[in-house]
Amino acid sequence: MTAPSQVLKIRRPDDWHLHLRDGDMLKTVVPYTSEIYGRAIVMPNLAPPVTTVEAAVAYRQRILDAVPAGHNFTPLMTCYLTDSLDPNELERGFNEGVFTAAKLYPANATTNSSHGVTSIDAIMPVLERMEKIGMPLLVHGEVTHADIDIFDREARFIESVMEPLRQRLTALKVVFEHITTKDAADYVRDGNERLAATITPQHLMFNRNHMLVGGVRPHLYCLPILKRNIHQQALRELVASGFNRVFLGTDSAPHARHRKESSCGCAGCFNAPTALGSYATVFEEMNALQHFEAFCSVNGPQFYGLPVNDTFIELVREEQQVAESIALTDDTLVPFLAGETVRWSVKQ
């Protein structure tokens, strides 16, 4: 006899960290987000990056054009910070409701980040303006110096960049994105109300052993890279505690299969189809389902000063198999947990 399925009804969630790419890839991946989430913070690391109001408006329209009829989805656009960015352009975009936040990529930290910031001092006028107007700063928190081990880059970023920055601009709202370490979990938990964090499903579900033991699993390779089990455990404990300044940010980052399964593969997990069920599984494993809705649907809007969504969705607890791949025009896309049986999924 099979156990009856369970249903979780939650306020419609938002994704506070998402890559949608552009062109045909954009058209393929947008529906996986727009059918589930009310809003998403869209990353600006296109080629070339989104650095002007005009570019953000055009990109937003391309996203909206890819949203299927019947989906009620609002993309929240971000500005890519560069050493040469004009603070007036940033403020104009924020005041006009085009830019929700600005994104700090240390130069060469991740995909399409070669235009990123070379030093905090180089963009201090921009950051001071953001502090003044109340615009959130979203941070990819890794140092990129060649001599620093890839597994240490987040912890080093906290001491060398994040803490000095927050000491200098004490009123600046900062989201420490896709945190992956106990160091970052402790730092955010011990911080004030102007510091928050997002966490991905892969960093809650897996550690570096899952990616490297018994063969390299390229579809678990993302940046920041998966860390040791002690770090994974710290992240799980943070979300399970009900801490209200951590929220859902999938960092869903699609790459065609041939760009992942290669001699020099790209970083990123395309988790949009399976992320919400993955988060539910983690919260269930941690006996913390009472905090699941807040993590997905309340904490983010609260930090950004936005209303929560007024519609609801349901997740059902019944085993389903994830597709092995998703068709692209001239390749395929391998989703997070491809071919695996998952416990929770969004009720269709």
Swiss-Prot record:
Listed under catalytic activity are: (S)-dihydroorotate + H2O = N-carbamoyl-L-aspartate + H(+)
Instruction: Say which domain of life the source belongs to.
Output: Bacteria
Where is Zn(2+) 1 annotated to bind? Answer: H17, H19, K103, D251
Query: Which Gene Ontology biological process is one annotated for this entry?
Result: 'de novo' UMP biosynthetic process
Q: Name one GO molecular function term.
A: zinc ion binding
What does the record's cofactor remark say about binding? Binds 2 Zn(2+) ions per subunit.
Q: Where is Zn(2+) 2 annotated to bind? A: K103, H140, H178
Task: Return any one Pfam family short name.
Answer: Amidohydro_1
UniProt pathway: Pyrimidine metabolism; UMP biosynthesis via de novo pathway; (S)-dihydroorotate from bicarbonate: step 3/3
Write down the SUPFAM superfamilies for this protein, in alphabetical order.
Metallo-dependent hydrolases
Residues annotated as the enzyme's active site:
D251
Residues recorded as binding substrate, renumbered to this chain, are: H19, L20, R21, N45, H140, L223, H255, A267
EC number(s) on file: 3.5.2.3
Record-listed N6-carboxylysine modification sites: K103
Q: Which GO terms describe its cellular component?
A: cytosol
* EC top class named in words: hydrolase
> Which UniProt keywords are listed?
Hydrolase, Metal-binding, Pyrimidine biosynthesis, Zinc
The record's InterPro entries line, in alphabetical order, gives: Amidohydro-rel, DHOdimr, Dihydroorotase_CS, Metal_Hydrolase
* Names of the cofactor(s): Zn(2+)
Q: Member of which family?
A: Belongs to the metallo-dependent hydrolases superfamily. DHOase family. Class II DHOase subfamily.
Complex formation: Homodimer.
So what does this one do? Catalyzes the reversible cyclization of carbamoyl aspartate to dihydroorotate.
Q: What is this protein called?
A: Dihydroorotase
Native source species: Escherichia coli O139:H28 (strain E24377A / ETEC)
The top of its lineage is:
Bacteria, Pseudomonadati, Pseudomonadota, Gammaproteobacteria, Enterobacterales
